[in-house]
């Protein structure tokens, strides 16, 4: 099985687009709308992709990043607005892609992080 990339994304259409991009990069995507614990995922995770966004009500999906253990897999954050970019930096994501222009770097970024 190719390395598993966990996608934390609550919007189905965004999740589907990320899944397609990750599959095209020869990784196995697993998508969850929110994450309580990495132990909930039945496979070893090589990297995490999360869209940082403040939309809707309740806790945003990206809030799960703050609750991860110290030894968590590398996190690639995708953000559009300045406040979202700042939030990704606050969460100490290993890579922050500024959408839409940095999205083309997702494949290259995952390959570098995962090492395949």
Regions found by a protein language model. Give the residues of each.
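His-Asp phosphorelay/catalytic-motif detector in bacterial-type signaling
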Residues: 68-76
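Conserved phosphotransfer microenvironments
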Residues: 15, 36, 45-68, 81
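Short, structured coil segments at secondary-structure junctions
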Residues: 25, 71, 90-93
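C-terminal output helix
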Residues: 101-110
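Conserved acidic segment of CheY-like receiver
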Residues: 2-12, 18-22, 48
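Alpha4 helix (beta4-alpha4-beta5 surface) of REC/receiver domains from two-component response regulators
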Residues: 79-97
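Short hydrophobic/Thr-rich beta-strand motif most characteristic of the beta2 strand and flanking loop
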Residues: 26-36
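The C-terminal output helix
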Residues: 111-116
């Amino acid at each position: 099985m190719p390395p598993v990339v966990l996608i934390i994304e609550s919007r189905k259409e965004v999740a589907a687009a990320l899944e397609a991009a990750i599959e095209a990069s020869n990784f196995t995507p697993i998508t969850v709308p929110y994450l309580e614990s990495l132990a909930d995922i039945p496979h070893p995770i090589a990297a995490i992709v999360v869209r940082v966004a403040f939309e809707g009500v309740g806790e945003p999906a990206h809030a799960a990043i703050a609750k991860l253990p110290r030894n968590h897999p590398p996190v690639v954050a995708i953000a559009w607005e300045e406040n979202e970019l700042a939030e990704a930096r606050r969460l100490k994501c290993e890579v922050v892609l500024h959408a839409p222009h940095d999205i083309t770097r997702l494949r290259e970024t995952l390959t570098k992080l995962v090492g395949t």
